[in-house]
Amino acid sequence: MWLSGRGLRCVRGGREVFDGLGFEAAGGEALALVGHNGAGKTSLLRLIAGLLAPAAGTITFDGGEPDTPVAEQAHYLGHRDALKPSLSVTENLAFWREFLGGEPTDLPAAIEAVGLAHAAELPAAYLSAGQRRRLSIARLLVVRRPIWLLDEPTSALDVRGQEAFGRLMSDHLAGGGLIIAATHSPLGIAAREMRIGAAA
C-alpha cells in the first residue's frame, strides 16, 4: 500500500498556500509534516482527506487512478473533536461508526483502548478536554481504515494519554497502516519528517 501526491497546489481565500508539492508514503510508515504556522500542513491533510480540492496536481492511493478517492480509505482527525455533547461516549462512537459506514465492531474495546471505560455512559459535554480528545481518537478504532490523517493529534493529552496514543499508532503501523500527521510536538513513534514551507 502506498499514497502519493504530485504537483499539488493549494489556494485558500485567494492566497496560494503551496505549489508544486509532492510526497510519497508507504504502508507501515509514519510521515510527520513540520513547518511554521500557516505553511500548509493542515491544508495538505485536508487535500488528502478530500475536504479541499487541489488547484492543481493529483493524489493517488495504492497505485490506482489519480481520481480514485482517498477519503473512503482514510480517517481525518482534525483540531476539533467533532463530538455530539448530548450523546454519551458509547453513543458518539456508535454514531460515527454508522456515519462512516463501518462494519459492526467492538465499541467497548475501543473505549477501553483510550481509557474511557469508566465514562462510557457519560455525555460528552461532561468530559474534560483530554477526555474529549481521547474519545475523538477512539473514532479511529471503530471503523478500520488504512490511512490516518492526524492534525495535532496529541493536543490536550497528558503524558499518559500521549503514551497510550503512541501505542495505538504503533499497532496501526505494525498492521500495515499509514499515518500522516501535522504536529509541533513529538508523535512518540518513529516518523519521517517532511517540511512544508520555508524554515521558520
From Swiss-Prot:
Q: What is its EC number?
A: 7.6.2.5
Query: Reaction catalysed?
Result: heme b(in) + ATP + H2O = heme b(out) + ADP + phosphate + H(+)
SMART domains assigned to the protein according to its UniProt record, in alphabetical order: AAA (SM00382)
Output the InterPro entries linked to this UniProt entry. Answer: AAA+_ATPase, ABC_transporter-like_ATP-bd, ABC_transporter-like_CS, ABC_transptr_haem_export_CcmA, P-loop_NTPase
Which keywords has UniProt assigned to this entry? ATP-binding, Cell inner membrane, Cell membrane, Cytochrome c-type biogenesis, Membrane, Nucleotide-binding, Translocase, Transport
GO biological process annotation, one example: cytochrome complex assembly
Kindly list the GO CC terms recorded for this protein.
plasma membrane
Protein family:
Belongs to the ABC transporter superfamily. CcmA exporter (TC 3.A.1.107) family.
Assembly, per entry? The complex is composed of two ATP-binding proteins (CcmA) and two transmembrane proteins (CcmB).
Task performed by this protein? Part of the ABC transporter complex CcmAB involved in the biogenesis of c-type cytochromes; once thought to export heme, this seems not to be the case, but its exact role is uncertain. Responsible for energy coupling to the transport system.
Q: What is this protein called?
A: Cytochrome c biogenesis ATP-binding export protein CcmA
